[in-house]
Curated annotation (Swiss-Prot):
Biophysicochemical property: pH dependence: Optimum pH is 6.0.
Any GO molecular function: lysozyme activity
Keywords, in A-Z order: Antimicrobial, Bacteriolytic enzyme, Glycosidase, Hydrolase
Function: Possesses lytic activity against M.lysodeikticus and several fish pathogenic bacteria.
One BP annotation, GO: defense response to Gram-positive bacterium
Catalytic reaction annotation: Hydrolysis of (1->4)-beta-linkages between N-acetylmuramic acid and N-acetyl-D-glucosamine residues in a peptidoglycan and between N-acetyl-D-glucosamine residues in chitodextrins
Name under which the protein is recorded: Lysozyme g
Active site residues of this protein: E71, D84
EC numbers on record: 3.2.1.17
Pfam families: SLT
InterPro entries assigned to the protein according to its UniProt record, in alphabetical order: Glyco_hydro_23 (IPR002152), Lysozyme-like_dom_sf (IPR023346), Transglycosylase_SLT_dom_1 (IPR008258)
């Protein structure tokens, strides 16, 4: 099953707030590409797992790499595999390279496998596919590429928070999640993660 081609998805790239992670003096697609490039050295150790999982789910490996880049900076932002500390819960909200949401008030998933394992990548990619399929059902008139972008946004904040294509990122982290991930995926696709 084809979920659309990441190279054909329209994107405005990272917001200024997101690009500030790396003290970049610019935003947009250029910033997303730069952040993907910065993470590429760390990403290389996961490449074979990414390719294998992508092939098994029909998801472009570049998209998996891009989510890893955005969510955990290829593992660089994790503490023993955990990320997104929640001071109210006194616990982390997310697990692994792709930051599976384990918060009972959020995604409520149970972490599967080691933080950088193939099992983790399979779980997270399965969650992504579920969200793409939900967006397909919710917006059957959208092109595959628009549904793919909507699914990326839903991976971040749930399909109930995607209301329109024009406002696809209005509820995402940084208000740029699907645009930034798409631009990073396009960079990874052009730099060895084409499957």
């Amino acid at each position: 099953m084809s979920y659309g081609q990441i190279r054909l998805v329209e994107t405005s790239g990272a917001s200024g707030a997101t690009s500030q992670q790396d003290n970049l003096g610019y935003s947009g697609v250029k910033a997303s590409h730069k952040m993907a490039e910065i993470d590429s050295g760390r990403m290389s150790k996961y490449k074979s797992k990414i390719n294998k999982v992508g092939q098994s789910y029909g998801i472009e490996p570049a998209l998996i790499a891009a989510i890893i880049s955005r969510e955990s900076r290829a593992g660089n932002q994790l503490k023993d595999g955990w990320g997104d500390w929640n001071p109210q819960r006194q616990a982390y909200n997310a697990w692994g390279l792709m930051q599976v949401d384990v918060n009972p008030n959020g995604g409520g998933h149970t972490a599967v496998g080691g933080w950088d394992s193939e099992d983790h990548l399979r779980q997270a990619t399965g969650i992504l596919v579920t969200f793409i399929e939900r967006i397909r059902t919710k917006f059957p008139g959208w092109s595959k590429e628009k549904q793919l972008k909507g699914g990326i946004a839903a991976y971040n904040m749930g399909d109930k928070n995607v209301h329109s294509y024009e406002g696809v990122d209005e509820n995402t982290t940084g208000r740029d999640y699907s645009n930034d991930v798409t631009a990073r995926a396009q960079w990874y696709r052009d730099n060895g993660y084409s499957g």
